[in-house]
A protein has these predicted regions:
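Basic, polyanion-binding surface patches
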Residues: 1-154
Length: 154
């Protein structure tokens, strides 16, 4: 999250990547958030070029049309976020792309009756410095928990 009001996020992409060309041309993109069972497919898609490979077909992904942008998202991903580019900032090896979040697609099994999303149930993965890590733990705390007063028992 870059900003909550309005909702925004950022990604970094190397300018020589095919996905970068698509983003620059359309000024739209989708952030698909895969679960750990998709790690091998995610790695394959990160290594192989879409210029020479039909990665969607090869990985057997099911594509669904987005609601607010002219793109598709991967139905197998428990979370997908539709974005509209606001700004692109060249940094060096990567360009920082800041985007408005237009809408999201979230597996309903991850939401409770109040609409809260339980990301720990999604078994999402994180990529950091060339390694894939599971995100399976519960939250370590929510904003302000260090100073929040404890509720008194009745």
């Amino acid at each position: 999250t870059v900003c909550t009001k309005p909702p925004m996020l950022s990604i970094s992409v190397r300018p020589h990547r095919l996905s970068y060309e698509y983003i620059k041309e359309s000024m739209e993109f989708v952030v698909n958030m895969p679960h750990s069972n998709m790690t091998k497919a995610v790695d394959y898609c990160g290594v192989k070029s879409g210029r020479t490979n039909d990665k969607i077909k090869e990985m057997g992904f099911t594509m669904k049309e987005c609601r607010q942008i002219n793109a598709s998202y991967i139905d197998e991903c428990p979370v997908a976020i539709e974005c509209k580019v606001k700004q692109i900032i060249p940094l060096g090896t990567h360009d920082l792309i800041i985007a408005d979040v237009l809408c999201s697609h979230i597996d309903e099994s991850l939401m409770d009756e109040k609409g809260k999303i339980h990301f720990e149930e999604a078994n999402l993965i994180n990529y950091c410095h060339g390694e894939y890590y599971p995100m399976t733990k519960k939250s370590l705390g929510s904003f302000g928990y260090s100073v929040r007063k404890k509720k008194k028992k009745k």
